[in-house]
């Protein structure tokens, strides 16, 4: 009985310690991305742009045949969680997370926010995004 009580107490302490740690973490790894609409303060639009709208039904953020992914987000701070996995070869590679804008209906790569460490994949990375970032452009380094 004491063990059960102690385990319950430890679980509650763990929940309190970690509460709020990832309150605003956007995970594009294992979920469908809606074409529009709010999700924890984040708005998605044109997350994969490949010519005439190919690849728009992909799950998660995947780099298109042009080698990039783009989406819009609301002006709130948070974390972007990505899982890097190279499906074509075993070579390590990096990913650049940049500011992005739409100009003339096409995504444009802006200022570099972060470059991930070299990964062979699958490897999880988390990038902090501040409230001034309203468009994200992801590409291979």
Model-derived regions, located:
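Beta-strand signatures of extracellular beta-sandwich domains
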Residues: 94-98
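Sec/Tat signal peptide C-region and signal peptidase I cleavage site
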Residues: 15-20
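A short aromatic-anchored loop/beta-hairpin motif
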Residues: 43-51, 58
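Terminal, low-complexity interaction segments
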Residues: 21-40, 51, 89, 99-141
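Sec-dependent N-terminal signal peptides
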Residues: 4-13
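Residue-level recognition of well-ordered beta-strand positions that form the cores
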Residues: 83-85
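Short beta-strands within extracellular/lumenal beta-sheet-rich domains
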Residues: 53-81, 90-93, 122-126
